[in-house]
């Protein structure tokens, strides 16, 4: 039943039935851990891979010995970086050793290798002052993949692909004649036997001897016209290098460099792990009948007799005794199964080798050689260390290739299985660390080329490491990654939840991933392996659906990049569900039966029911309780954080839940945040991990609290003194222009622990996420103002500032050097009256606190005009008045159209103060304008269940429907928005909200484990309401009751970032496009509304000829006509006849460009001369109604947000996650040095 739960400083009444067994880990650890790995191991791996760099003679060799990030010399703090548009980074120092092998001379030096961007505690990077997030990428894991397709007759054809991390692909395929072909690196196909001959077994006999008798192999050999190893090598060389003279040696070295050279072919740790897992012998021989006695080669004892079934443990024992091929008996034939010769080192080396840190299987022949030649423990360890790259090879080896062929031969007989490429066991994450590592590797390999060249050119004796190394390629590739990679995105900072979600996002796009166009339905679809790893609900609508996902709440990423999810182990002996938590990847989970988290348990932890519903891969089965292997840890395990914040999610249709998840991320932080009455209990965790709240670093006592600072005296003083200071952010601008403001929660004398929340941030209330407001509402129509999801709101919401938010915009002006002299920031602006300068100080910059409207001057700036040859009089004036009379024009920064507000901050950067400015800039001024935006007609609002709508009317409070106790409703929603959309969760939320508000509760109803219908009825009755949650409503205008009782209660409603003030737009005259001379389009360009083809039809249909003519000419692109019209309107005369539209001239020119002789004739068939340029007719006007095409409103720095908003409205299927970085598509590195 309902029970109190302490969440931070608030007590919630929880309806959950299931006790939490597993702590949710830090929600942004996927970012933090990955970057930490990169600093500790990732960088070292790259240096190890490239060591040593030798010149072409092999005489000089350059080695990277070690590296460190110089944390002492970080130039600016995070806050300063944001202010100064700098990058938050630390200098990377690498110690380099240069060895001259002829003279034996060794030189060591520390080389500076550029500033390396650091991750902030929040899991973000500050790049050029903008906060960015690196999104994790979901890619296909390297490994061996088998696939099956059917030919025309319905026969199964098996194919395989061997995919490395980088390097040449191997593909096998079978045709209808049972011949197996191979393609090497996407070339034309060859019979498989050619590859086998070239690698090892030259003659037909050897091949059959090795692989065993098989019809398909024999058919392939027949097809093959080579008979020896040499012929096969030449054949392959001809295919791979057509046109070059083939020789056996060059063919050998070609194959060697294609597959067996670690520099060219890299499997990576994951690849090796997946290869060994797929090609392991024991998986294919388990549960098969042995066709002969299997003898352990070391002891000589028989492990399995002929005709005996090989069980799983025996199979593993056989593999780990070094046996690599086993014959198994099928119905009417014997099949040979060949592994890839990798074994568990622990079954051979009996002493402790944990310090060697070997987690993978090792290559048996190499290990055997070491063990045969050495017996001493230390020597064996030494040899293992020395040969680690042969024991665990980074590239593919012959044994791997032979094993993949053997697997292909066994598939038609049901030995082995085909793979599903959308399974999360075959897709992995590249997080920040790995993406950075790959980028760094590209930079280093470019640098390596430079070093080699310099080694050969420079004088061998005077050479130093510093002189050899050019760090430009390295710093450039890092800069390129952070600045323009598709995966480095401008952080979505609308509210704490959107920040958190952005850091937990998984994208299948980006370099080396999929492209939107190529991605089919299967990749985007929900897969059974997503359970507990990736949210099936949260994904954008539009072209990116299913390609961009969100990490589930409990998911973790393992060392190989596979996503794991926790399960509770069921003790098979006693039937008890233990508290042992085991994290499993998707392919491990496939072997087990897993019970749901809400399965009821006895007090001793055993299942109550005898039959249990379990998941088995994609099926749901009912099995006896003895067969269950694991159990989910929590019902919210399968969804993401945003989805877990929707109460009664189980009662909503999935597509509406998707909208609900996505719209919570667009909620604007309000002036007075208010936590939801009906929450799910995850609000506190989400807020604490989203990094918008200051948390205590060490336990202690609060000694000082002000609006901007909190000081905590630590219980145990350490090297940083005994007081921790926490600076609070006050009215800062977020990336999206919302307001970031923190206010203290603790008071003087409070005791705090580690991680105690000290202050509330934007959209948080007592440390819980608070995106919206609890609003008293009813499902009732009102005079048609609810039509099509519109919302009717009470004036109270405007008056009481319930939905008021603060928005801060940033504008900047820079004074540059021009060809004609420097620009100047000054109060002295030509042709501007004193009235316009009333709020401008003596520097020419607006004062803080001034109220500004559109068109007001923010920064006065003048630019020198082109000087003409001066006359004698002018020269005299110059001599008398000095420079004052110089020709300048006004280029001041003004408030753009439709913007207004109060100046809250002004920052000035100059060269004299030692600020770093971009070249040619002498002074930079930034102004911040804040606006309070009250809720108004046209704003978009939404609940948490995908029930969105636009405000249609603000009604006086006294006209709103009111309850029997006299309280008026605050919002009326349309009841028709519920049944067809099937998001019943909103109705249950309203009922529970009504009861909870009366009882004074805040409730938690976790997803899939929340309040049931009887519980809600009980709560309503406890609060003194009817069990159905309906009540009589009275019309506010007449006082009469409405005919039927109405559902009334409290719903949590959000105000979304689509505000009408940002969208409304009007234009009289403005900029025109250069070629067609038609007005530009869009708010950002201050454009006009297009009167398009269909609108023209409408006017034609009405026969409105004159209206149509002026719309197509003087109102659009008749250049002369529109100027004359403007003049006529100003002078009050009649509007003149229109001329020829510019676009008509363009059309004629286009036809002439196609070599068509086009003339324009009048009624009498006389040619009309069309003037090329309208300048002859141009009337000199006082008014400039022209604007140049490149006119745009002054841009806010790092903020393409307005345009994004603009495009959101243009496309109905707008994609929320298409970051504006996608504009830099052209710069993509298509893959990591990889042709595929």
UniProtKB/Swiss-Prot annotation:
Single GO molecular function: ribonucleoside binding
Source superkingdom: Bacteria
Pfam families cross-referenced by the UniProt entry: RNA_pol_Rpb2_1 (PF04563), RNA_pol_Rpb2_2 (PF04561), RNA_pol_Rpb2_3 (PF04565), RNA_pol_Rpb2_45 (PF10385), RNA_pol_Rpb2_6 (PF00562), RNA_pol_Rpb2_7 (PF04560)
Residues covered by region (Disordered): 1185-1236
Protein name (Swiss-Prot/TrEMBL): DNA-directed RNA polymerase subunit beta
Compositionally biased region (Acidic residues): 1201-1220
Family designation: Belongs to the RNA polymerase beta chain family.
UniProt keyword annotations, A-Z: DNA-directed RNA polymerase, Nucleotidyltransferase, Transcription, Transferase
Catalyzed reactions per annotation: RNA(n) + a ribonucleoside 5'-triphosphate = RNA(n+1) + diphosphate
Enzyme class at the top of the EC tree: transferase
Job description of the protein: DNA-dependent RNA polymerase catalyzes the transcription of DNA into RNA using the four ribonucleoside triphosphates as substrates.
EC number, as in UniProt: 2.7.7.6
Subunit structure: The RNAP catalytic core consists of 2 alpha, 1 beta, 1 beta' and 1 omega subunit. When a sigma factor is associated with the core the holoenzyme is formed, which can initiate transcription.
Organism the protein comes from: Clostridium tetani (strain Massachusetts / E88)
GO BP of this protein: DNA-templated transcription
InterPro entries named among the record's database cross-references: DNA-dir_RNA_pol_bsu_external_1, DNA-dir_RNA_pol_su2, DNA-dir_RNAP_su2_dom, DNA-dir_RNAP_su2_hyb_sf, RNA_pol_bsu_bac, RNA_pol_bsu_CS, RNA_pol_bsu_protrusion, RNA_pol_Rpb2_2
